[in-house]
Swiss-Prot record:
Protein name (database record): Tryptophan--tRNA ligase, mitochondrial
PANTHER family attached to this UniProt entry: TRYPTOPHAN--TRNA LIGASE, MITOCHONDRIAL
NCBIfam families for this protein: trpS (TIGR00233)
Gene: wars2
GO BP annotation list: tryptophanyl-tRNA aminoacylation
Catalytic function, reaction form: tRNA(Trp) + L-tryptophan + ATP = L-tryptophyl-tRNA(Trp) + AMP + diphosphate + H(+)
Length: 377
């Protein structure tokens, strides 16, 4: 479903969970326009809805104490839980050093905050600070078959060029950890990209298996929230590949920490083609089509209008427009990144407070799960 299709006004509690790996020290433009854009829209929708309901209650309740009590319930009705999933990073074939992983975790938190994630409205924490994620993963691993995990598309893709002896059990059970992340908070909705939809289907399957094995219906079956982004953001050097933090070519992506000059240089060096004119044709002209998508997303101008405006203009003129459009989006984020980098204690405190809130929910649910399974605690 799309974000606008989520009924935040329904009486049923909505809990949204999503996470991002700290595989790099900075998010890129694709992250910002894709997953982060989704998160920000959800944050705005939930905040607006909670505020409207609170105002209605304040009008209808004559007792201030009663109103205060009801407002607390409203604020707890919809939960937004966003995590830096550092445990998932350990499954990467290109492992980060301990210092890199810790540094990246703080850097990604800074990027979240700079993009607009508000810790007053969202539970923001890093995954490894909530031990219940690992405990639930083990429980779910015990009801998941090897054949189901080994047939997951991403596992096959990541291991097809690897020696079997070098493939870790962590990579195999990656979907189980992801399922635990989601089910631990009884998430009802999860915003994901196209490449993660099978993992969400797996999460629903594992919830069903848990209910069947233990004769208990504890977990909701989470719904997938698909991206509102009209076009995927691809590599600046290959319009057929997704823009990625792990791409060894730095010029393939725009990082949120890039200076104006770096952005201009990367766009100047971005791959196009020899065909005259700026037209949108993802099949035959993937590179220029990708640049048009980025221009549309960052400027708010429809691709059809951009084609009309630049159809007879050179690539250089179009790239100048694109650079300025990206800079307009990124420069205020970069300023906020600099602010949080100068205040590391503030960032650590935000993660600590977020982990305390997450632990409270996670431990409560895990204890119920242990009772269902028969684990003494």
């Amino acid at each position: 479903m799309k974000i606008d299709e989520v009924n935040f006004k329904d009486k049923t509690k909505v809990t949204v969970f999503s996470g991002m790996q700290p595989t790099s020290s900075a998010l890129h433009l694709g992250n910002y326009l894709g997953a982060m854009g989704n998160w920000l829209k959800i944050q705005d929708l939930v905040t607006k809805n909670n505020k409207e309901e609170e105002e209605l209650l304040n009008l209808s309740e004559s007792s201030s104490s009663s109103s205060s009590s009801q407002s607390t319930k409203i604020n707890e009705k919809h939960k937004l839980i966003f995590s830096i999933v550092d445990l998932h990073s350990l499954t990467s074939t290109k492992s980060l050093s301990p210092k890199e992983l810790q540094s990246n975790t703080i850097s990604v938190a800074i990027n979240y905050l700079a993009c607009g994630i508000d810790p007053e409205k969202v539970i923001l924490f890093n995954q490894s600070m909530v031990p219940a994620h690992s405990e639930l993963t083990w429980i779910l691993n015990c009801i998941t078959s090897f054949s189901k995990l080994s047939n997951m598309i991403q596992f096959k893709e990541k291991t097809k060029s690897s020696n079997e002896a070098s493939v870790s059990n962590g990579l195999l059970s990656y979907p189980v950890l992801m399922a635990a992340d989601i089910l631990l908070y009884k998430a009802t909705h999860v915003p994901v990209g196209e490449d993660q939809t099978q993992h969400l289907e797996f999460t629903r399957d594992i919830a069903q298996a848990f209910h069947s094995n233990f004769k208990s219906k504890f977990f909701p079956y989470p719904s997938i929230i698909t991206s509102e982004q009209s076009k995927r953001i691809m590599s600046l050097q290959d319009g057929r590949l997704k823009m990625s933090k792990s791409d060894p070519l730095e010029i393939s992506r725009i990082s949120l920490t890039d200076t104006d000059d770096q952005i201009k240089l990367k766009i100047k060096k971005s791959k196009t083609d020899t065909i005259i004119g700026i037209t949108y044709d993802p099949i035959n002209r993937p590179d220029i089509s990708n640049l048009l998508s980025i221009a549309s997303e960052t400027s708010g101008i429809p691709i059809t209008d951009l084609q009309s405006e630049f159809k007879d203009k050179s690539n250089a003129i179009f790239k100048e427009f694109l650079s300025n459009s990206i800079i307009k989006n990124i420069s205020p984020i970069r300023e906020k990144i600099n602010y949080y980098q100068s205040n590391p204690k503030l960032v650590r405190d935000i993660l600590l407070q977020g982990s305390e809130k997450a632990n409270k929910i996670a431990n409560k649910n895990l204890n119920i799960i242990k009772d269902i399974v028969g684990l003494y605690h």
